[in-house]
Swiss-Prot record:
Assembly mode: Part of the 30S ribosomal subunit. Contacts proteins S5 and S12.
Gene that encodes it: rpsH
Annotated InterPro entries: Ribosomal_uS8 (IPR000630), Ribosomal_uS8_CS (IPR047863), Ribosomal_uS8_sf (IPR035987)
A biological process term (GO) from this entry: translation
NCBIfam families: PRK00136.1
Pfam families referenced in this protein's UniProt entry, alphabetically: Ribosomal_S8
Keywords, in A-Z order: Ribonucleoprotein, Ribosomal protein, RNA-binding, rRNA-binding
Stated role: One of the primary rRNA binding proteins, it binds directly to 16S rRNA central domain where it helps coordinate assembly of the platform of the 30S subunit.
CC per GO annotation: ribonucleoprotein complex; ribosome
Protein's UniProt name: Small ribosomal subunit protein uS8
A GO MF label: structural constituent of ribosome
Length: 132
């Protein structure tokens, strides 16, 4: 089966694993998925990310994070720019997710950045997803 939107699949797998409180999630690797996972780790939404190399495409292992009482750290993930409808943001119109409580993941000429980093570097790009 050919997957038309591997980023949406990745976000859905994280959302589903988070809903049933799995500790670890494994997905097929790609550069953009690695970048998204690293941003989630850097921003404190997941505990850790491991990239396991094999002879094929590799695997990304994401360790999900929960609060003291088992509450989810990731409330939701939403795919914004889709293959059928791309969404771009200029450097002056960078989106804010829940007034700064969440993050927007932006694909820029300088790589994958959060909305805050894109504002600091004064670059625009494709709005990949919102995480809060």
């Amino acid at each position: 089966m050919v997957m038309t939107d591997p980023i949406a699949d990745f976000l859905t797998r994280i959302r589903n694993a988070n809903q049933v409180k799995h500790e670890v999630l494994e997905v097929p690797a790609s550069n953009i998925k690695k970048g998204i996972a690293e941003i989630l780790k850097r921003e404190g939404f997941v505990k850790n990310v491991e990239v396991i190399e094999d002879d094929k495409q590799g695997i990304i292992r994401v360790f999900l994070k929960y609060g003291k009482n088992g509450e989810r750290v990731i409330t939701n993930l939403k795919r914004i720019s889709k293959p059928g409808l791309r969404v771009y943001a200029k450097r002056d119109d960078m989106p804010k997710v829940l007034n700064g409580l969440g993050i927007a993941i932006i694909s820029t000429s300088e790589g994958l950045l959060t909305d805050k980093e894109a504002r600091q570097k004064n670059v625009g790009g494709e709005v990949i997803a919102y995480v809060w």
